[in-house]
Amino acid sequence: MALTSSSVPTLWRLARLDFDSVRQQHVLLYPEGTVLLNPTGAAILELCDGRRSVAAIAKILEERYQSDVLADVTEYLSALCDRELIRDA
């Protein structure tokens, strides 16, 4: 399921963000596995609180990175939604 700019993403209830001190990398943990996150992926997921829309998340990141990121954020979250790690609140 593709998310839109008005979707309000939240993590699947059994998934959680963590920092792997061995790898020195952020990870998304879920019962069946782990997704290794780069700093940008971690920044996106930290903003997925079930209150902010995809557009609001992108706006925060655009200010932080001085770049138009809406399409990239939407694509990234849609891919995680397809894997059922993110849902539209």
Regions found by a protein language model. Give the residues of each.
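Long, charge-rich, low-complexity alpha-helical segments
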Residues: 33-89
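Acidic, low-complexity/disordered tracts enriched in E/D and polar residues
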Residues: 1-46, 74
